[in-house]
């Protein structure tokens, strides 16, 4: 089985690495900031219409292409984006949300292929295929 879709949006620049550390009863904890909660909600809302009827159960390759807008920059369509955030951190957050929505049973099944680009049409392209 293979699923692919494009979510038009300006991709987020916050990742799980941007959690805030707090101390509660002498113990350190990481909590989502209001901004990170908004990013997760935005991604969840865009992912929800694409959840498969049944989750993938075996290994899957998840290709994610994060495309930031070229408008107002000196970058050209298709140029690799080599600035933060890290593609690995973006894909970790994406896969955690996809697991919670029911794309697959556990994100340990995922063989990630994240890429970052500048694009005339911003958004996130996702392809999921059974291996």
Task: Write out the residue ranges for each language-model feature.
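Acidic, proline/glycine-enriched N-terminal capping motif
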Residues: 1-131
């Amino acid at each position: 089985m293979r699923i692919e879709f494009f979510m038009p949006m300006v991709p987020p620049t916050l990742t799980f690495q941007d959690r805030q550390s707090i101390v509660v009863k002498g113990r350190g904890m990481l909590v989502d900031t209001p901004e990170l909660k908004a990013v997760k909600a935005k991604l969840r809302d865009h992912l929800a219409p694409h959840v498969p009827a049944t989750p993938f159960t075996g290994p899957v390759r998840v290709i994610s292409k994060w495309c930031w807008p070229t408008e107002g920059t000196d970058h050209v369509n298709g140029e690799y984006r080599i600035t933060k955030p890290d593609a690995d951190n973006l894909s970790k957050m994406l896969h955690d949300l996809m697991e919670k929505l029911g794309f697959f049973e556990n994100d340990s099944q995922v063989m990630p292929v994240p890429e970052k680009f500048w694009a005339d049409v911003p958004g996130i392209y996702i392809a999921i295929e059974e291996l």
